[in-house]
């Protein structure tokens, strides 16, 4: 499938056998691809043991991994932490939602929780497996007018949705209280030298020290060197404290991210000094060390050894905190430069007296080609696979060729689709002159387009569609060029990690894209042009009990239902019914408006338009229940009232009667937003909007129940025959 091929080529996930990794880059891939929430580092710890097995590593009861080389003085300890921030399940609600406690509870940026809202996650089971889940997020459609909108930063408003309907469903899946939870794994190449993704700042030290261990295994260097991969660094440095108590080294080098000097900021009211730029080399965090032997740029940071219970550990006089510059730290789009990793590795090898490892990092990155189209199906395609194909196609408003072509390929061979001047894909049954009914779903999705290229290599973006900036800023992105796809990150402004910052409520606030370039010329060298479009990566995940989650279910579910209905109607269906897959809905129903106007001018306005689009469900703990919920798993929804239309009550009842006749589960309700059918009303048509319940609309965590999709396809088929 499209996303699977993309993920193998561009979104780099964990490799199956850590021991095979031989370069810093290859180590980095599986290290970042392994979840290791503080206190739950077991899987990563064991992979490190496997990677080091030829060197006789030791592993203690809390997962610290150590390996020693050489003999005599001085005794150097070079340590790095392997844990990452995350959450642990603290309670399971009767309706299947998970409540969580954060690990660590303090010390993270003020908006850390908010940036997890409406994002894909991985939750661990008792058996050590990982299951997909999402964090609940507020929908922009239901927020206007609310007096007390839940604070997205407050962990009391954090709910995890794994698709379960009951506590028993959760427990049957293997998830329980104490299950760890962390962001879904992805590592993205950005430009020729940068990597971006979750836990980048928590794993680069391990990638460096694995290389150092291999060099020492070949040539031990001078004195004694102990390399340690320590756990629970976010929990008052418990792993490092234990190793220090055991080793009593003469010198200590800690390799890892820096912490902001929070106490100093509180005293002075100042912001912490910015780190050196990416690509400028290794850095010394905190107090510089002339004894280390390599010059490093110094940057202030809080001490890496955090005091817990008991007396403080006395560090040797010769102690250094070494690292690399990080951009957007502690976010899903956290970024570093592999040239800095090389510089740090060379410095460490010089320090211990072993051979320098030549860089094996790739000097350039090419765009990932778009996959070849799938073959046309010879029989009715599976509804879930149809949905996967359509959701994993990318098509921002105004650039919808990919999903339109995907729909066309999925249609049966006996139909003859046409495309109008607005880009709408049309299938006509009957004589086609004046259809009695039009069914319409839109092909576009939220995203951005490149508005301009700045002198510093950043890209100014135009927003296409509406959604919360907190769901997109600071997250990995894909830039779609004429040659293929490039990795990028939707940039965060300076000061995003301070309490003064707040995400804007309006998605139309301009966003910026980081493509790993330092100038406009470097952008041009990557093949990027004004007008290229940008999306957030996506992959359809199957959750518990028949539910799925992926961005762009709005409105690829509607598109899927119509594809299924066309197949079900068959080649001998001759009623005057038209199916339209419309464009630019997210920009104001523009494709639908063009079709409606053209139909009116031709005297072909239909009597009824069935606009098929999302019912933004309040079936979540975060939304106001003054709306009829539109519960997942209980059938399609007659979208009786929204921001653009009121369906005549008699038509609501008529749809429900046809549904009941065919035992199709049906609901009706009130929601927000607009629908394509509203553009036909001025010309005399009745807009009868059909929907399915969707949680977390306009976010990366959109979530549905496949039973509702089947019900939607069934009612479209039935209405085509009987309305």
Where are these regions (language model features)?
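N-terminal hydrophobic/helix-forming segments and targeting peptides
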Residues: 18-723
């Amino acid at each position: 499938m499209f996303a699977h091929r993309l993920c193998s080529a561009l979104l780099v996930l964990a490799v199956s056998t850590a021991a095979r990794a031989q370069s810093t880059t290859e180590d980095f891939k599986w290290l970042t691809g392994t979840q290791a929430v503080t206190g739950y580092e077991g899987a990563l710890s064991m992979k490190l043991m496997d990677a080091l097995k030829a060197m006789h590593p030791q592993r203690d009861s809390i997962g610290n991994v150590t390996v020693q080389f050489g003999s005599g003085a001085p005794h150097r300890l070079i340590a790095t932490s392997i844990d990452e921030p995350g959450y642990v399940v603290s309670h399971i609600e009767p309706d299947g939602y998970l409540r969580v406690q954060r690990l660590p509870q303090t010390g993270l940026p003020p908006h850390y929780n908010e940036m997890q809202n409406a994002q894909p996650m991985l939750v661990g089971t008792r058996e050590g497996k990982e299951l997909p889940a999402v964090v609940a997020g507020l929908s922009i459609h239901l927020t206007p007018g609310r007096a007390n909108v839940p604070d997205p930063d407050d962990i009391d408003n954090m709910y995890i949705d794994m698709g379960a309907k009951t506590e028993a469903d959760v427990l049957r899946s293997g998830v329980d209280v104490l299950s760890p939870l962390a962001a879904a794994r992805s590592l993205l190449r950005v430009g020729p030298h940068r990597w971006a993704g979750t836990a980048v700042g928590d794993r680069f030290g391990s990638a460096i020290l694995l290389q150092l261990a291999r060099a020492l295994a070949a040539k031990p260097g001078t004195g004694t060197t102990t390399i340690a991969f320590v756990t629970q660094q976010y929990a008052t440095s418990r792993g490092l404290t234990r190793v220090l108590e055991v080793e009593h080294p003469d010198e200590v080098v800690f390799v890892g991210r820096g912490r902001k000097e929070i106490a100093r900021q509180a005293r002075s009211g100042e912001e912490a000094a910015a780190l050196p730029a990416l690509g400028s080399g290794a850095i010394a965090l905190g107090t510089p060390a002339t004894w280390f032997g390599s010059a490093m740029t110094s940057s202030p940071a809080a001490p890496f050894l955090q005091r817990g219970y008991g007396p403080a550990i006395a560090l040797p006089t010769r102690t250094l905190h070494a690292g690399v510059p990080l951009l957007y730290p502690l976010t899903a789009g956290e970024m570093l430069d592999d040239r800095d990793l090389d510089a740090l590795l060379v410095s460490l090898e010089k320090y211990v007296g072993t051979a320098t490892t030549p860089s094996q990092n790739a000097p350039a990155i090419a765009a990932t080609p778009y996959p070849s189209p799938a073959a046309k199906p010879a029989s009715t395609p599976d509804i879930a696979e149809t949905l996967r194909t359509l959701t994993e196609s990318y098509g921002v408003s105004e650039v919808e060729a990919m999903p339109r072509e995907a729909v066309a390929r999925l249609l049966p061979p006996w139909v003859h689709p046409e495309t109008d001047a607005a880009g709408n894909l049309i299938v006509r049954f009957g004589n086609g002159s004046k259809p009695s009914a039009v069914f319409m779903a839109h092909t576009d999705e939220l995203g951005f387009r490149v508005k301009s290229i700045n002198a510093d290599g950043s890209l100014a973006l135009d927003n296409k569609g509406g959604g919360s900036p907190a769901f997109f800023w600071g997250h990995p992105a894909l830039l779609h060029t004429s040659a293929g796809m490039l990795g990028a990150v939707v940039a965060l402004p300076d000061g995003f990690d301070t309490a003064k910052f707040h995400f804007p409520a309006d998605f139309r606030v301009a966003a910026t894209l980081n493509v790993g370039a330092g100038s406009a010329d470097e952008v041009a060298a990557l093949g990027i042009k004004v007008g290229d479009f940008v999306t957030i990566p996506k992959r359809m995940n199957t959750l518990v009990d028949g539910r799925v989650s992926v961005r762009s279910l709005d409105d690829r579910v509607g598109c899927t239902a119509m594809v299924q209905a066309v197949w079900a109607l068959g080649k001998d269906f001759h009623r005057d019914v038209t199916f339209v897959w419309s464009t630019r809905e997210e920009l104001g129903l523009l494709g639908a408006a063009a079709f409606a106007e053209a139909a009116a001018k031709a005297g072909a306005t239909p009597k009824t338009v069935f606009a098929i689009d999302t019912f933004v469900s309040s079936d979540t703990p975060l939304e106001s229940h003054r709306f009829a919920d539109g519960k997942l798993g209980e059938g399609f929804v007659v979208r009786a009232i929204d921001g653009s239309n009121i369906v005549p009550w008699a038509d609501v009842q008529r749809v429900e009667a046809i549904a009941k006749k065919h035992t199709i589960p049906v609901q009706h309700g009130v929601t927000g937003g607009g629908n394509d059918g509203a553009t036909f009303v001025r010309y005399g048509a009745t807009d009868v909007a059909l929907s399915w319940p969707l949680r977390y609309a306009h976010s990366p965590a959109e979530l549905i129940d496949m039973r509702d999709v089947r019900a939607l396809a069934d009612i479209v088929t039935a209405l085509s025959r009987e309305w």
